[in-house]
Swiss-Prot record:
Top-rank EC class of the record's enzyme: hydrolase
Similarity annotation: Belongs to the SurE nucleotidase family.
Keywords, in A-Z order: Cytoplasm, Hydrolase, Metal-binding, Nucleotide-binding
Family annotation (NCBIfam families): PRK00346.1-1, PRK00346.1-3, PRK00346.1-4, surE
Residues annotated for a divalent metal cation binding in this entry: 8-9, 39, 92
Cofactors demanded by this protein: a divalent metal cation
Source organism: Erwinia tasmaniensis (strain DSM 17950 / CFBP 7177 / CIP 109463 / NCPPB 4357 / Et1/99)
Protein name, UniProt field: 5'/3'-nucleotidase SurE
Amino acid sequence: MRILLSNDDGIHAPGIQTLAKSLREFAEVQVVAPDRNRSGASNSLTLETPLRTFNYPNGDIAVQMGTPTDCVYLGVNALMRPMPDIVVSGINAGPNLGDDVIYSGTVAAAMEGRHLGLPALAVSLDGYQHYDTAAAVTCSILKALLREPLRTGRILNINVPDLPLDQIKGIRVTRCGSRHPSSQAIAQQDPRGNTLYWIGPPGEKLDAGPDTDFAAVDEGYVSVTALHVDLTAHAAQQVVSSWLASAEVTREW
């Protein structure tokens, strides 16, 4: 198995380094990751400036000023040859649950892999301590994929409780929950009296029902949520069509 490994916390983050070490015990791994923390970068691509890379002695590649999506794009299309069999993103420091997936660079890296035609996993730890647990879970899932490929055409978003491995209760297939909207913008002043702003913390849980990713992780289970790239709200298409007709929206602009 040839694995392209990326993240959004940066190439030196403990999550990606722990996971790379574990994956290399049974797979060929190429790390291509941002040279710094790019959390919250979502699916952004660098289009107006060229991208430079730095190669470490162990073969890891950092993309300077690159986003997670940049890294996977370059990894698949230029930097890993032969091409990878699968894209893995993580281990993220902190969860990517519910609405987090909209903003997550970790999920975006996996989404880019899927967009480029490859199976893809995004892995996050619900905390900042037991990266070895998340690495063991990821390796177990990847070995299962080797034995029996999963042909869903979807991204697997995996969230792991921040617990010792022997305290993990199992794995649940879940749906994304949701949070209340985040509404805080924290204002400060720089030494010259200019106002600057920090984006506030995420909103509190809104939908954390028993079948959600929030509930699974809170109860000590690994959450596995299948995500897809198609954002079309298929169930709403007829409603929108009927509204356009009843509202008499015409081509007479």
